[in-house]
Curated annotation (Swiss-Prot):
This is Lipid droplet hydrolase 1. It is an enzyme of class 3 (hydrolase). InterPro entries: AB_hydrolase_1 (IPR000073), AB_hydrolase_fold (IPR029058), AB_hydrolase_sf (IPR050266). The active site is at 177 (charge relay system). Pfam families: Abhydrolase_1 (PF00561). GO terms for cellular component: endoplasmic reticulum; lipid droplet; membrane. The gene is LDH1. It comes from Saccharomyces cerevisiae (strain ATCC 204508 / S288c) (Baker's yeast). Serine hydrolase required for the maintenance of steady state level of non-polar and polar lipids of lipid droplets and thus plays a role in maintaining the lipids homeostasis. Exhibits both esterase and triacylglycerol lipase activity. Disruption phenotype: Leads to the appearance of giant lipid droplets and an excessive accumulation of non-polar lipids and phospholipids upon growth on medium containing oleic acid as a sole carbon source. It catalyses: a triacylglycerol + H2O = a diacylglycerol + a fatty acid + H(+). Belongs to the AB hydrolase superfamily. Lipase family.
Length: 375
């Protein structure tokens, strides 16, 4: 992508809803709804927030683990013509997130003729639910899924379980929020040995050690388990006290810093709100119960192996109340200095950085990640 094309790609974020309505129509209808939650839940509204780009690149995979089978929604631009180039960008969403949150970056990577793959985590979006959500089991699923997708669509790799699906490929692993932990576990436990991971990109990573989710915090663990078994308790709070506030609910106010009447911004907020009310309380609590902190000493040790040349790039959001930029000090002090290439702080931006300031995120991602993946 030349300079003129890059400027055009990062200047304006666009989208095409499958409903065929304009963004102005969709936003106006939502703003005029007497009961926003009831309106957003209507089946006929679904296509207002289903984008053509996502639909054209959507594929479901049945992923088999030793103790569970899952139907996982993916979005990728791989095809029977093979994988574009040798680099595949793998995007891992965070807690209560789904693949749609990466849409601006997916379009950017696609426009640069690069391959991408992302997924709805189990229990979120359109992926099947689990009876429980151990974080390392989710990580295993992501690894198996990536292998399955590469085997299916790579013309250079036979569709054979005995063949290394990463042969000839470089992986850029991108995680958002909790997805940063999933990406780090994925790298340390499964992908370091493949020698395929070129870069890890951590978008608004959470606090490195969340004491409240420690397994020795027995009272908190029992409380979470109680809500997991009786999710309607959390539903009462979400439905009666939070989501009724619409775009003033916590899931919007904490995810967005930008304000104003820009129709694209309003559309993204309503899109986020629709995803928020679709998430089940049981799934959210299940992920908190299954939380596993990264062993940062072990992770750093894997990074510093002499035959590894990984790069780590961190994006923080200046106005993020969920993952404050102060949390990044741990990563800057802990991660090997030769691997930590850059820490980028996005001004006037909150937690859902791809929806809050998509143009700024794309501009920095193009310069710091995509362009450097060519080196």
């Amino acid at each position: 992508m030349n300079m003129a094309e890059r400027a055009e790609a990062t200047k304006s974020w666009s989208c095409e809803p499958l409903s065929g309505k304009t963004l102005e129509e969709i936003v106006q209808n939502a703003e005029n709804a007497a009961d926003l939650v009831a309106y957003i839940r209507k089946p006929e509204v679904d296509l207002d927030f289903r984008l053509k780009f996502i639909a054209e690149h959507e594929e479901f995979f049945n992923v088999q683990l030793s103790d569970r089978n899952s139907r996982i929604r993916t979005c990728h631009n791989l095809s029977d013509k093979g994988i574009r180039g040798d680099t595949v960008f793998v995007f891992v969403p965070g807690l209560a997130g789904n693949l749609e949150q990466f849409e601006p970056l997916l379009e950017l990577v696609d426009s640069d003729q690069k391959a991408f793959l992302t997924l709805d985590l189990p229990g979120f979006g359109h992926s099947s639910e689990w009876s429980d959500y151990p974080m390392l089991k989710v990580v295993e699923l992501i690894f198996v899924l990536v292998c399955d997708v590469l085997r299916k669509w790579s013309t250079a790799v036979p569709n054979n379980d005995n063949v290394n699906p990463f042969n000839g490929h470089k992986i850029v692993l991108v995680g958002h929020s909790m997805g940063c932990f999933l990406a780090c576990h994925l790298y340390e436990q499964h992908m370091a040995d493949t020698k395929a991971v070129q870069t890890l990109v951590l978008l608004t990573p959470p606090k490195a050690h969340i004491e409240q989710l420690s397994k020795d915090k027995h009272i908190i663990q029992w409380a979470l388990y109680g809500v997991f078994k009786l999710p309607w308790l959390f539903d009462v709070y979400r439905n009666k006290f939070d989501q009724v506030k619409g775009l003033q609910s916590s899931g919007i106010k904490q995810y967005f810093y930008q304000q104003g009447d820009d129709v694209k911004l309003k559309y993204r907020k309503f899109w986020q709100f629709k995803n928020n009310i679709s998430n089940k309380s049981r799934t959210i609590i299940g992920y908190l119960l299954g939380w596993e902190t990264v062993d940062w000493v072990k992770f750093n040790g894997v990074l510093t192996q002499t035959d590894m040349k990984q790069k780590i790039i961190i994006f923080g959001a200046e106005k993020d109340p969920i993952a404050p930029i102060e949390n990044l000090e741990f990563y800057k002090q802990t991660i090997n200095k030769e691997c930590l290439r850059k820490v980028i702080i996005l001004p006037d931006c909150s937690h859902n950085l791809c929806f809050d300031r998509p143009e700024l995120v794309c501009e920095n991602f193009q310069r710091e990640v995509i362009d450097n993946s060519k080196l």
